[in-house]
Design a protein with these regions (language model features):
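Solvent-exposed edge beta-strands and adjacent loop segments
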Residues: 1-74, 178-198
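Beta-strand-rich interaction surfaces with strong enrichment in secreted/lumenal proteins
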Residues: 36-37, 100, 160-162
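Surface-exposed coil/turn segments at beta-strand junctions on protein surfaces, enriched
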Residues: 40-42, 105, 154, 165, ...
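Extracellular structured ligand-interaction cores
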Residues: 44-46, 134, 156
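Secondary-structure transition/turn motif
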Residues: 52-53, 114-117, 160-168, 206-207
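Extended beta-strand solenoid/passenger and fiber regions
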Residues: 62-149, 174-208
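A surface-exposed beta-strand-loop module
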Residues: 143-168
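Generic detector of short, aliphatic-rich beta-strand segments that form the cores of beta-sheets
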Residues: 168-174
Length: 208
């Protein structure tokens, strides 16, 4: 199996559904109180593609499904509801979130992240599949220049500085994809009428 660094055609996702999934274990006690334990440290997204608007959409999904060999290969998917590190309705900025990494004058590698914060609760999501050309990075809120000051591994989300930061706060932002695979080996297309085809194609996030 392999991960194919290609984005699922976003033009045929407008009829899709899906979003994040968590795994929680709940035990109900005798008095009706609950004991809740989170099983996963990280969310796992699930999606479903269900409708195609044009003949080209149908050709595209058939070609893509065969190329991925069903569930075998992974690929990128744009989640239209959550694909930017800041607000989903504004362009990413170099100061969206503090990156994960040690600032000590030695370490040069920092992980792109998105932080979801409500009150004192925060979930830090590692961004492993940033979109090429969208990454912006800053030191103490001063925007730096890709290649001149740092490089980005767009297959892992790791930002590598040419010179290790010493005391600065490292921040960054980007657009990103979700690493996924098809969650079926069967492409079950329904011919409801002439040139009208629907389907239920499950897609699930994979850990990379």
């Amino acid at each position: 199996m392999a991960f194919i660094e290609t984005q699922f055609p976003s033009s045929i996702q407008y009829s899709s559904s899906g979003g994040p999934q968590w795994r929680t274990e709940i035990v109900e006690l005798n008095g009706g109180q609950e004991q809740r334990n989170t099983i996963w440290d990280d969310t796992r997204h699930r999606y479903n593609i269900s409708e195609f608007k044009t003949d080209n959409d149908i050709d595209t999904i058939i070609r893509f499904f065969h190329a991925m060999q069903g569930q075998y290969h992974g690929f990128r998917l744009k989640d239209w509801a959550d694909y930017r590190t800041g607000s989903n309705y504004a362009a990413p900025s170099a100061t969206d979130h503090i990156l994960v990494g040690t600032v000590d004058g030695v370490n040069t590698d920092f992980q792109l992240v998105k932080r979801y914060t409500v009150s004192t609760n925060e979930y830090v999501r590692y961004i492993k599949k940033p979109v090429n050309g969208t990454v912006l990075v800053s030191l103490d809120d001063v925007t730096k220049t890709e290649t001149t000051d740092y490089t980005v591994d767009y297959t892992t989300g790791i930002v590598t500085f040419n010179t290790a930061p010493t005391v600065e706060v490292v921040k960054g932002g980007c657009e990103f994809d979700v690493p996924v695979r098809f969650d079926t080996d069967t492409l079950d297309l329904h011919h409801s009428s002439y040139q009208a085809i629907t389907a239920s194609i499950p897609i699930v996030e994979i850990r990379v």
